[in-house]
């Protein structure tokens, strides 16, 4: 899909915010490509991010906006996880069908399956989603999925 000028302006605003955090050199580190896209409301898989120019480590490559834009457009067309996909994945760990899994199982799912997050990334996600365990150490995974899919700025 072709982006309108308003959409491109919105992309540029978010890109410039990442550039501001990244040293104000007119470019964003390619390692942050997926993060920029997620802030813009798409949820690309890491393999797809790498395929359009994302990198595995900070400092390998910088992306000016002119290179970011076609990468973003390419990622718009990629398969993305849906709410139903994530709910179905968590249901497999919900033995009693009550909508809860243990905090330990949540960590296991996030470190061992799919995109395999680091412990630091999981700590950050749990902190950002303000995830609360009940007295038995369980979390309501529907709330978790909704908060993660809403992104870091859900009111935007």
UniProtKB/Swiss-Prot annotation:
SUPFAM superfamilies, A to Z: EF-hand
Protein keywords: Motor protein, Muscle protein, Myosin, Repeat
Lineage, top ranks: Eukaryota, Metazoa, Spiralia, Lophotrochozoa, Mollusca
Protein name as catalogued: Myosin, essential light chain, adductor muscle
Matching PROSITE patterns: EF_HAND_2 (PS50222)
Domain called EF-hand: residue spans: 6-43, 81-116
GO cellular component, one term: muscle myosin complex
A GO molecular-function annotation: calcium ion binding
Keyword Metal-binding: no
Protein role: In molluscan muscle, calcium regulation is associated with myosin rather than with actin. Muscle myosin contains two types of light chains: the catalytic light chain, essential for ATPase activity, and the regulatory light chain, a calcium-binding protein responsible for Ca(2+) dependent binding and Ca(2+) dependent Mg-ATPase activity.
């Amino acid at each position: 899909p072709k982006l309108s000028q308003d959409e491109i302006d919105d992309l540029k605003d978010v890109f410039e915010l990442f550039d501001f955090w990244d040293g104000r050199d007119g470019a964003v580190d390619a390692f942050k490509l997926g993060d920029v896209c997620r802030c813009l409301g798409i949820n690309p898989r890491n393999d797809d991010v790498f395929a359009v120019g994302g990198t595995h480590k900070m400092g390998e490559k910088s992306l000016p906006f002119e290179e970011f834009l076609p990468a973003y457009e390419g990622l718009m067309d990629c398969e993305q996880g849906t709410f139903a996909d994530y709910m179905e994945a968590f249901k497999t760990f919900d033995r009693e069908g009550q909508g809860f899994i243990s905090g330990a199982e949540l960590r296991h799912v996030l470190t061992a399956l799919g995109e395999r997050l680091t412990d630091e990334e999981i700590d950050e996600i749990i902190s950002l989603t303000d995830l609360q365990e009940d007295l038995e150490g369980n979390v309501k995974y529907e709330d978790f999925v909704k908060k993660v899919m809403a992104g870091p700025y859900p009111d935007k």
